[in-house]
Amino acid sequence: MALPKANRLKSRHDFQAVFREGLRRNSSHFTLRALKPSSARKSSLDTAAQTQPVDEVQNIPSTLIGVSISTKVSKRAVVRNRIKRQITAAMQQLLPRLAPGWKLVVIVKPTAAESKCGSQQFLQELEQLLAQTEVLHGHS
């Protein structure tokens, strides 16, 4: 099942901002890049924040999630698409527990295609990465 449109990270500019300024956490199958809402607001809306009304500035947008999977992971698009579907399904399950306003990019490592992991292991690994970056509500 796909992520809701409101939670998809789509623009090249957003991806570049996350790669340039975001936190990085690694696991055996993924690298998670996460950009905090406050740092994103400071870098891109310095002058815009002064012109907007106060209540609009405090409106925190929903968490945006993107998945990056290169041909180095697998030459076959079928394999890459299957992994991407498993990741988006796992992120959709975790979506209600995510703090609002974050921009997240999940980068898939080649080990994800080599090991025949199920979506349950992907879910567990993503949950650990999100807890490390303190994106999950109730992280410890």
Curated annotation (Swiss-Prot):
It catalyses: Endonucleolytic cleavage of RNA, removing 5'-extranucleotides from tRNA precursor. GO terms for biological process: tRNA 5'-leader removal. One of its GO terms (cellular component) is ribonuclease P complex. It is an enzyme of class 3 (hydrolase). This is Ribonuclease P protein component. RNaseP catalyzes the removal of the 5'-leader sequence from pre-tRNA to produce the mature 5'-terminus. It can also cleave other RNA substrates such as 4.5S RNA. The protein component plays an auxiliary but essential role in vivo by binding to the 5'-leader sequence and broadening the substrate specificity of the ribozyme. Consists of a catalytic RNA component (M1 or rnpB) and a protein subunit. InterPro entries: Ribosomal_Su5_D2-typ_SF, Ribsml_uS5_D2-typ_fold_subgr, RNase_P. Keywords: Endonuclease, Hydrolase, Nuclease, RNA-binding, tRNA processing. It comes from the Bacteria. GO terms for molecular function: 3'-tRNA processing endoribonuclease activity; ribonuclease P activity; tRNA binding. Disulfide bonds: none annotated. NCBIfam families: rnpA. Gene3D superfamilies: 3.30.230.10. Its EC number is 3.1.26.5. Belongs to the RnpA family.
